[in-house]
Amino acid sequence: ASRYILEMVIQQLPERRMNLKVSHPAYGFETIGVTEYDSKEYVARKKEYIQKWNLTAAVKEMKKQKRGMVIEPERQICVYIDPVTPDPFVVCIKNAVNQWGKAFEAAGWKNVFRFSSDKEDASLSYRTILFRWGSAYNGIYSSVIENPVTGEILCARVNVMDVAADELLGMYFLQCGLLDGRIRKDLHSLAVRQDVLTAQVAAAFAEVLKMKPNKAGYTVFTPADIRSEKWLNRYGITASITSGVTFNYLAQPGDGVSVKNLFPRVSAYDYDAIRYAYGNSDALPSMRGAFYTPEDKLDPYAQDGFLSNDILNASIQGVESVKKIYPQLNGWINRLPEDQNTWKNVSDFAVRAQSLFQTYLTQMVKLVGGRSVRPIIKGVNETLVTYVPREQQVGALN
């Protein structure tokens, strides 16, 4: 016979007014469907409202916010960080959450999140986000509890470990090794692992905010933008962190790009989406190419791992980078610490480099017959389907 211990948390839904926000196709949020009945016209209309945290303040404070002032919510969202989390990675979690905190501040709310490792905050209770260290061997995992009636996010849990970052270090070594000496000195560089994990937590936190992955985020900026330190300091390498982590493989030695700009972060679309959901704005995304786009295998501009709005030239640049790195792999690995300086690593990275080369070629192939489907939005987009221009398809074949 087997014996099990089951734990159950039962929460009474709070009796609070929720400021509902109608869903808009330009922004990707999880939604609830509400059927509204009009007793005057005797008609029923179904509307979609986004799921979000309920930020409230006194009427007097809300008036200040409408005048453009930044205010604090009546009750902050507690971000509990498991005390067993190693100190270097506590910093990663805080930095990632603070990136989103700045987006909320731009929407008119300051000090939305407060950090805690106190025992009394360790329960999955109302307006709490628990960061637990462990049970994240296959990537950062999150679960969210929401009110099915109002769409209010009640609490959330995120399981995180540095194992998630370790899995990307090999890719970072190949894509950014020419620019980041830290990874050439140590394949397990703590500083690099921190940078990778910060980006991963920032991406995962979008799920806690019930934001859908915007697969168009990485294909908004031009290759020149992504190689410009000035541009990167302002926007980073993607218009949205929501679709996961891709590194800046377009930057080259001589571009003057700092290592911090080799990683994605919360950016323009994310700020616009938070402003739409929590601020006083109904504006569309500030960058037209950043409108919400779900994953589409036939759309070359909605794929994981693609970078820039010029996929052909970006892929060619990626191929050229692999050609530069491949002959240097043996020398790089010979200069690594003794436990990493092995023939197995030489062999493994040679195979990975060849696989990366093939990945860039596959990106070019995606242009052939590629098409993009975008929602019809009056005054913005009135064409449902657009196809990759003929010259780009021919260029990919040549």
Segments predicted by a language model, with ranges:
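Loop/turn elements at helix/coil->beta-strand transitions in domains of secreted/extracellular proteins
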Residues: 76, 109-111, 152, 239
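Soluble non-cytosolic domains of exported or imported proteins
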Residues: 44, 83, 87-95, 191-196, ...
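Zn2+-dependent metallopeptidase catalytic core
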Residues: 86-112
